[in-house]
Design a protein with these regions (language model features):
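ABC-family nucleotide-binding domains
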Residues: 138
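Catalytic Walker B motif of ABC-type/P-loop ATPase nucleotide-binding domains
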Residues: 128-131
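The feature captures the beta-strand-to-loop junction immediately N-terminal to the Walker
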Residues: 14-16
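ABC ATPase C-loop
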Residues: 120-122
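Conserved ABC ATPase signature
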Residues: 103-107, 111
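Conserved ABC ATPase "signature" region
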Residues: 84-99
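Conserved ABC transporter NBD signature motif
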Residues: 37-53
Length: 193
């Protein structure tokens, strides 16, 4: 498997269950080592530790990523400049400001998802990896998630999205990688489908 995940672009990874999407995410963000080959960043081979430092990961099960007692506290984990006015703006950007002092674990699934994506954005990491970021998100907030991922990419991050949602992938991907049991195909924006 050979792929590039360009800074400033959104790459969606799609494929059937069991083809290795989760394994690929784990390797990319440094939670697992590749079984063979290397992973490079800026042309340099990277260690797992370097990849972990470069990546912000949004897992599908967002409840496992909530650690603070407050919404703003979630934003400041790994991003000390996301408090005060910056934190309030970020919460407003994700339609969460009205939730005030609610405990993060008391939020709905879609609200938790938006909070964790906001926290990933607040880190300013070079690579943002999201596993099924639209799960639990209602249609009203899908456009907001797409716009946010676009903003994160425009700020210079490589955004990598694992999704089963073909419509979402079509709406936001600059590059689509489809994994199959026999390999992978890659289509870039503007390529014939």
């Amino acid at each position: 498997f050979d792929a590039d995940f360009p800074a400033g672009q959104i790459t969606c990874i799609a494929g059937e269950n069991g083809v290795g999407k989760t394994t690929l995410v784990r390797v990319l963000c440094g939670l697992a080592a590749p079984s063979s080959g290397t992973i490079t960043l800026d042309g340099q081979t990277t260690s797992r530790r370097q990849r972990r430092a470069a990546c912000a990961l949004v897992m599908q099960d967002t409840g496992r990523q909530l650690f603070s007692d407050t919404l703003e506290g979630e934003l400041t984990i790994g991003a000390s400049d996301a408090s005060g006015e910056a934190g309030e703006k970020l919460l407003a950007d994700f339609d969460l400001a009205h939730l005030g002092e609610r405990h993060p674990l008391s939020l709905s699934g879609g609200q938790k998802q938006r909070l964790v994506i906001a926290a990933a954005r607040a880190t300013g990491r070079r690579i943002v990896i999201l596993d099924e970021p639209t799960s639990g998100v209602d249609a009203r907030h899908l456009d907001s998630i797409t716009a946010t991922l676009r903003r994160i990419a425009e700020e210079g991050a490589a955004v990598i999205v694992v999704t089963h949602d073909g419509e979402f992938a079509s709406a936001c991907a600059d590059q689509l990688i489809t994994l199959t049991p026999t390999g992978a195909t890659c289509a870039r924006e503007g390529d014939p489908q």
